[in-house]
Amino acid sequence: MRVRIALQVAAASLMVGTCFAAAGAAEAAVALAPHRAVYDLKLLKSHGKRSIEAVRGRILYDFTGSACEGYALQFRQVSEIDSGEGKVALSDLRAATWEDGDAKSFRFNSENKVNERAVETVDGSAGRDGSGVSVKLSKPQPKNFDLDAKIVFPTEHVRRVIEAAEAGKSLLELSVFDGSESGDKVFSTLAVIGNVIAPGEKLPDDAAAGNATLAALKRWPVTISYFEQGAAKTGEQTPAYSIGFELYENGISRALSLDYGDFIVSGTMSKLELKDAAACK
């Protein structure tokens, strides 16, 4: 199973402007809120070729920083997947990233274990200049490669989604590099943005409920589909996975829906802690 969230909700998922790569950090129009959130996972639906009996798990999402000092993310997703007939797999994905406020530098490190055995470790960095993006991997194997200048990093991605939502747009297509999986993949993404949910409408029933800061903010239902670049195109493309959530204008996400194709997992925000943002000097 591909157990992951694009570091938008977050990455991602959870996190998901004009081009912030060219804007000064102090001029960034979207202010992302430092916060720590916990999401409880459970199986919502199972269909297709792979039958999943149950999914239990949790996501810990710890986002800190500012446009001036850069953004850091500590992410952990632990999932127990029961495929029936006594076959249970425990997946433990840990990731740490840092992205500067101008979206010119990005560092990433992740480790994925299945049944306590490491199956994937990635470590690397990416830097943007006028001509493109250069990536240096130290794990899983040393490797250097270049990417198109149009690709965006995870925090920049969420800022672009929020900016598009604020502008009343319903679709946003971007190529995203988040250092996930083998560390060398770029995903073509399509964000579908629903109608704005104004403060006081459709009150949340999770940890966001009663939070005075969030109660005063707009939010949007968003679904982001991730397509592997370079995959064979035969008719209508099927996304590698999709992430649905409600996105607040400060970057906090709730009501997650992780669609892996053969099954869908829901993520309910069970804890939320807002942190103070450091003032730009």
Give each language-model segment a name.
Residues 1-18:
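Bacterial N-terminal signal peptides that target proteins for export
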Residues 19-23:
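N-terminal signal peptide c-region/cleavage motif recognized by signal peptidases
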Residues 24-70, 74-85:
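N-terminal cleavable signal peptides for secretion/export
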Residues 41-45, 61-67, 79-83, 97-101, ...:
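Beta-strand elements of well-folded, non-transmembrane domains
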Residues 28-34, 62-71, 98-104, 213-216, ...:
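A short, structured loop/turn motif at beta-sheet edges
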Residues 54-59, 90-94, 118-122, 238-242:
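Short, surface-exposed coil-to-beta transition loops
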Residues 75-127:
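Hydrophobic/aromatic-rich structural module bridging two neighboring secondary-structure elements via a short loop
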Residues 109-281:
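Mature, soluble, non-transmembrane domains
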